[in-house]
Structure formats: structure tokens, C-alpha cells
């Protein structure tokens, strides 16, 4: 799940 999409979600948080 993505927390706030940093750029393009580097390592899928």
C-alpha cells in the first residue's frame, strides 16, 4: 500500500 506516493513509490511502502 502506498502511504503518500513519493514520486513513483520507490519501494512500495
Curated annotation (Swiss-Prot):
The keyword rRNA-binding does not apply. Signal peptide: none annotated. Coiled coil: none annotated. Keywords: Antibiotic, Antimicrobial, Bacteriocin, Secreted. GO terms for biological process: cytolysis by host of symbiont cells; defense response to Gram-positive bacterium. One of its GO terms (cellular component) is extracellular region. It comes from the Bacteria. The keyword Transmembrane helix does not apply. Its main location: secreted. It is found in: Secreted. Antibacterial activity against the Gram-positive bacterium M.lysodeikticus. It may act as a pore-forming protein, creating a channel in the cell membrane. This is Bacteriocin rhamnosin A.
Amino acid at each position: 500500500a502506498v502511504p503518500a506516493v513519493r514520486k513513483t513509490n520507490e519501494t512500495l511502502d
